[in-house]
């Protein structure tokens, strides 16, 4: 599929093509950043306006009952649960990924200390050095609180690090920097064989790749909804806990929405049964209502083959992108950080550029290349590396969302990349000024 005409022909035959019409995509834009922020579903603006004007404006406080606000976090969790291998009643949308990770990692550490510390105490939490920073910050904070050691490793070191002194393994199912995807079931089996609990971050996986939490026998999982789920900026995250663990402990943020009888207004805390205990304070109804429109697209996608169809197209999109970049952009210092193995690849492709390849030999030029692409209407993003002081290079990230990305978009994006590199327009000063958000 190396010509524009061939890509267009495949688009005409693509079973998932009707789902693109569910999104309000700007004209002239090739959007390859759904792994950072999903686009606006067409239904969202009107639905949120109705929530604001009718449910809030006219219904006022009655809408907690009449509009079903009170149980919306659980209903949305039930709606999305099958897409991550969860059962009804096991998922709730609430708070942020960072806050939810604090809850479940706290619970996992406590569970490990109380039930898995025999014959010797478990003193370590393991994570990848390239894990998303907020995960590492939360883990660092909790390790300090519990007098544990946070051990950061490279992916290839993982098997040797699963030892009986480890309490919890904290991993992202799909790595944000490379797109590498772990075999969740195998990693979980290996961890459990050593008595280690698993906490999975699904931010770059949920809605993009097959996830089977119960089938993998995972322990805890969190994830955001503003990427592949298209819930909007800052949309509520989700939390899942394996049913065998849910009712064992309070999570540490014991707010009134997690109380067994919140409107009894008792002075002592009694946690709700099940996943509802992982909620904390009053829930953001407008944001949750916007998220519902994003999840409705997934409900519609079930008519077209569900995750099996999405994954098939995702693999094809990323395959074509890699093939075209290597054919059409050779000789410009780009490397591939993302696995070629489709069973180890998420729904993104990450390209590297060597330190010293930038203007006047400073930096990699990757940031400026991405800015030049964005100026042309090809939107991806940039993630900074170690600046030559470590193993991680600067990254140009491109996300491929089967709900709306076309093969024609892939071809055109690579052609723009080729032109940016060949013309060296990325060297212009305006593309080398660093913005607050990269």
Put a short name on every predicted segment.
Residues 1-438:
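Pyridoxal 5′-phosphate
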């Amino acid at each position: 599929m190396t010509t524009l005409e061939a890509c267009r022909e495949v688009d005409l035959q693509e079973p998932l093509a009707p789902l693109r019409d569910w999104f309000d995509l700007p004209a002239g834009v090739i959007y390859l950043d759904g792994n950072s922020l999903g686009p606006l579903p067409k239904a969202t603006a009107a639905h949120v306006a109705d929530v604001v004007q009718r449910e809030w404006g006219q219904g006022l406080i009655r809408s907690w009952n009449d509009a079903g606000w009170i149980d919306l976090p659980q209903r949305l969790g039930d709606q999305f649960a099958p897409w991550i291998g969860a059962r009804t009643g096991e998922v709730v949308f609430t708070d942020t990924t960072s806050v939810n990770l604090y809850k479940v990692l706290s619970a996992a550490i406590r569970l490990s200390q109380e039930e898995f510390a025999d014959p010797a105490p478990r003193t370590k939490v393991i994570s990848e050095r390239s894990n998303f920073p907020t995960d590492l910050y939360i883990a660092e904070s909790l390790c300090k609180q519990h007098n544990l050691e946070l051990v950061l490793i490279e992916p290839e070191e993982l098997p040797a690090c699963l030892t009986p002194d480890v309490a919890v393994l904290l991993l992202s199912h799909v790595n944000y920097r490379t797109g590498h995807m772990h075999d969740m079931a195998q990693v979980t089996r290996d961890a459990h064989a050593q008595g280690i609990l698993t906490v999975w971050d699904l931010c770059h996986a949920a809605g993009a790749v097959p996830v089977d939490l119960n089938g993998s026998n995972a322990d805890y999982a969190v994830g955001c909804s503003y990427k592949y789920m298209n819930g909007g900026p800052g949309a509520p995250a989700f939390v899942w806990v394996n049913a065998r663990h849910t009712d064992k402990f309070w999570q540490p943020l014991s707010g009134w929405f997690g109380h067994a009888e919140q409107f009894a207004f008792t002075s002592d805390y009694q946690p709700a049964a099940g996943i509802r205990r992982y909620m904390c304070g009053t829930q953001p109804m407008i944001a949750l209502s916007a998220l519902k429109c994003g999840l409705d697209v997934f409900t519609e996608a079930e008519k077209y083959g569900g995750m099996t169809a999405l994954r098939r197209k995702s693999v094809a999109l990323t395959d074509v992108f890699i093939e075209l970049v290597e054919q059409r952009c050779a000789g410009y210092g780009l490397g591939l950080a993302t696995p070629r193995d489709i069973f180890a690849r998420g729904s993104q492709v990450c390209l590297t550029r060597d330190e010293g390849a930038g203007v006047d030999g400073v930096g990699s030029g990757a940031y400026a290349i991405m800015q030049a692409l964005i100026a042309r209407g090809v939107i991806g993003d940039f993630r900074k590396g170690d600046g030559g002081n470590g193993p991680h290079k600067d990254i140009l990230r491109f996300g491929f969302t089967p709900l709306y990305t076309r093969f024609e978009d892939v071809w055109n994006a690579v052609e723009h990349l080729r032109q940016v590199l060949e013309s060296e327009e990325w060297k212009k000063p305006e593309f080398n000024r660093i913005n607050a958000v990269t």
